[in-house]
């Protein structure tokens, strides 16, 4: 049997989401894209128009889109559509400029963020730069309310600004594990309705992980101002009052020759005590996430000109201040030949061909970025960063009869990530020769003490403090990631050091939730296994305050029913309707199995990976804590877990049995209390909702106070 999965009809939900999110329509709602293929034609035409010979490239671009290349939602929605919606961007990911510790700059960055969200982009911020609650503000002659109170302003702004194309605004807030207000940050979202427009992540350092392992004390610190040091007569060599640390604040502070900032010690506590506060919150509330920030910066290709402190809202793009990145994913299920048979195989030549063409397509998106801020446009034009990843890994493994989490699945994940990376960097060199390298490659950088501290091998190569070195040399020869690429193809990286690459970054694995469900017919999200093979998914519908629950099937189940057994269903009791044992779901995989898959991909992904390790509700807390240490030891750049806990929040993907077994209480205005099962329908404010989704919308503040 040689099954053609291209011909499996799209399920109704997939078509509905394409229609509501990606289909181009006139201002009165009349469809302009007549079909999904016409959406592909629009995108291919817009990207080919950036070439010297558009007609030459239109056909290959359209072929790639028909064969597994899926640009991210902003590109699919907006490329070729600027005549109809001129204020929208093709860029999914941005990070705010550094928020300086002044009222003027805090409110200025709110304004910039509002414009960014209005253009349809997600945005991340580092709030570690704001002095802690209770610190004295000499200019105001008063004490500050701290970063959390200012985060509330950003939250309300995001809630108010309707993000373009009917999307809810997406924000990431990060805080350094050394910040004095870190515990307040960890626990902030326990208050109903607070910071609901944010994902929250901690910037976890290697020093903190070591302190936890060694049961050592941990200092909470924040920079002194230069004025404080002078007025209070603080000795710069007094370890009791001052420590030197890498910190993003660079204005009005004291900096040493290594680029470190003089910081005040606010409090010292056992590292394990702080660790337990984090773990308790993550176990019960699935937040904050972890960003292993030292690993992010060590492996950053632009290590010589960037200090990364924040990510986009889903965490797959760590970016510098004003950084921006566009995304795209390759649907791996497209390349499975003879699925579900002993002859099942992955078509590597076809995969490499799609990746090569798609790399050129994504590079062209830089020319039509439509970012709202000049500094964002300067960043993306100078570095030409993009993040190509894949989706459908779990579905693909099932079609190849490989269990997700097994040794074979880890090996396949590493191979597919390496093939994607190597093809991308080969294309980077070809494009640089044809069109020129990214401008930053030809820029000269003065060697600083910090650069020599971070890369001692530069001194061994005879490079001295104050020397001028081109970006292409610092990128290819001294980036830790590019040296991994050199282990496979040293000639390629040597030539990149001579010519410069077309872009500084090529790969990133996004969650792909909506494009997987729509354009990939519910192939598994990103690097994930399928959540379940038949389940309810909570989707945002324009104009509705609660999410709407829709019934969906996994792509691999649809394919199996189409190609092998039309009667097959999960949990079937009849022998003739059962699925093979390699049909597994997120709950069947151990937390360490999730981490192993992520680690296999991370070696070859030059940005980061958005991934969630699903944890059973009854998973022991002591074992849960070990997942994060295991993730750190495995070389990950970030880690997120999800444990079903309906009292705290409602996930995007929900199993029917979980809803049936969960009760929700609602108190009416007259004091009457009603109880409803999670899947029961309730009419409220003129709309029908499931009890679970209504409870979640009320809790998040979409109807005012909870």
Predicted regions and their residues:
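Catalytic alpha/beta core of large soluble enzyme barrels
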Residues: 14, 316-318, 362-367, 437, ...
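Structural signal for hydrophobic packing residues in well-ordered secondary-structure cores
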Residues: 1, 22, 43-51, 62-69, ...
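Glycine-rich phosphate/pyrophosphate-binding loops
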Residues: 119-131, 168-173, 400-406, 608-611, ...
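Long, charged, mostly alpha-helical binding arms that flank functional sites
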Residues: 324-388, 398, 572-578
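Acidic/polar, glycine-rich intrinsically disordered N-terminal extensions of enzymes
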Residues: 1-90, 238-262, 275-279, 629, ...
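Active-site cavity-forming subdomains of large catalytic enzyme subunits
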Residues: 4-8, 91-348, 371-375, 379, ...
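Core structural elements
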Residues: 10-19, 63-83, 177-178, 359-368, ...
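Secondary-structure capping and boundary motifs in well-ordered enzyme cores
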Residues: 10, 35-36, 83-87, 99-102, ...
């Amino acid at each position: 049997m040689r099954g053609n999965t291209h011909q499996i009809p799209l399920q109704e939900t997939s078509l509905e989401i394409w229609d509501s999110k990606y289909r181009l329509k006139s201002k009165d709602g009349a469809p302009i894209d007549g079909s999904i293929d016409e959406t592909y034609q629009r995108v291919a035409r817009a990207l080919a128009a950036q070439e010297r010979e558009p007609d030459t490239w239109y056909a290959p671009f359209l072929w790639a889109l028909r064969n597994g290349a899926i640009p991210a939602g902003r590109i699919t929605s907006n490329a070729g559509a600027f005549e109809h919606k001129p204020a929208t961007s093709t860029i999914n990911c941005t990070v705010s400029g550094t928020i300086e510790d002044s009222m003027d700059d805090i409110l200025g960055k709110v304004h910039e963020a509002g414009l960014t969200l209005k253009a349809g982009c997600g945005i991340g911020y580092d709030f570690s730069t704001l002095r802690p609650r209770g610190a004295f503000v000499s200019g105001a002659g008063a004490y500050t309310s701290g970063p959390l109170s200012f985060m509330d302003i950003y939250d309300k702004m995001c809630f108010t600004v309707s993000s373009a194309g009917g999307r809810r605004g997406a924000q990431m807030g990060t805080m350094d594990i050394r910040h004095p207000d870190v515990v307040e940050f960890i626990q902030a979202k326990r208050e109903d309705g607070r910071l609901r427009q944010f994902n929250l992540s901690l910037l976890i350092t290697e020093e903190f992980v070591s302190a936890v392992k060694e049961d050592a004390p941990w200092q909470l610190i924040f920079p002194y101002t230069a004025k404080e040091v002078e007025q209070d007569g603080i000795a710069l060599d007094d370890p009791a009052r001052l420590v030197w640390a890498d910190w993003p604040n660079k204005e009005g502070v004291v900096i040493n020759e290594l680029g470190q900032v003089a910081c005040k010690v606010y409090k010292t506590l056992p590292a394990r005590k702080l660790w337990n506060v984090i773990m308790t919150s993550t176990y019960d509330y699935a937040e904050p996430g972890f960003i292993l920030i030292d690993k992010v910066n060590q492996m950053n290709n632009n290590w010589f000109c960037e200090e990364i402190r924040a990510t986009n809202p889903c965490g797959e793009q760590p970016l510098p201040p004003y950084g921006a990145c566009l995304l795209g994913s390759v649907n791996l299920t497209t390349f499975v030949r003879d699925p579900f048979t002993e002859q099942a195989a992955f078509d590597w030549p076809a995969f490499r061909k799609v990746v090569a063409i798609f790399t050129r397509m994504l590079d062209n998106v830089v020319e039509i970025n439509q970012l709202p801020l000049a500094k964002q446009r300067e960043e993306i034009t100078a570095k030409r960063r993009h993040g190509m990843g894949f989706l459908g890994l779990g579905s693909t493994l099932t079609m190849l009869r490989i269990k997700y989490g097994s040794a074979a699945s880890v090996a396949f994940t590493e191979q597919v990530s390496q093939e994607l990376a190597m093809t991308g960097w080969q294309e980077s060199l070809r494009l640089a020769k044809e069109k020129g390298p990214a401008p930053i490659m030809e820029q000269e950088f003065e060697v600083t003490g910090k650069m020599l501290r971070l890369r001692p091998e530069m001194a061994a190569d005879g490079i001295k403090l104050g020397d001028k070195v081109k970006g292409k040399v610092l990128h290819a020869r001294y980036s830790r990631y590019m040296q991994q690429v050199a282990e496979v193809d040293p000639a390629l990286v040597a030539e990149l050091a001579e010519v410069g690459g077309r872009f500084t970054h090529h790969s990133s694995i996004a969650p792909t939730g909506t494009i997987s469900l729509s354009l990939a017919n519910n192939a598994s999200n990103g690097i994930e296994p399928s959540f379940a093979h038949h389940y309810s998914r909570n989707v945002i519908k324009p104009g509705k305050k609660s999410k709407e629950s829709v019934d969906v099937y996994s792509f691999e189940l649809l394919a199996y029913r189409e190609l092998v057994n039309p009667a097959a269903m999960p949990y079937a009791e009849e022998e003739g309707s059962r699925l093979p044992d390699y049909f597994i779901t997120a709950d069947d995989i151990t937390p360490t199995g999730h981490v192993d898959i992520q680690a296999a991909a991370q070696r070859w992904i030059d940005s980061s990976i958005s991934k969630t390790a699903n944890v059973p509700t009854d998973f022991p807390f002591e074992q849960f804590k070990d997942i994060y240490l295991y993730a750190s030891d495995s070389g990950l750049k970030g880690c997120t877990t999800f444990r079903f806990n309906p009292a705290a929040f409602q996930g995007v993907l929900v199993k029917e049995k979980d809803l049936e077994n969960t009760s929700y209480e609602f108190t009416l205005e007259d004091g009457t209390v009603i109880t409803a099962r999670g899947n029961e329908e309730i009419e409220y404010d003129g709309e029908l909702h499931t009890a679970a989704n209504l409870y979640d919308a009320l809790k998040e503040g979409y109807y005012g106070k909870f």
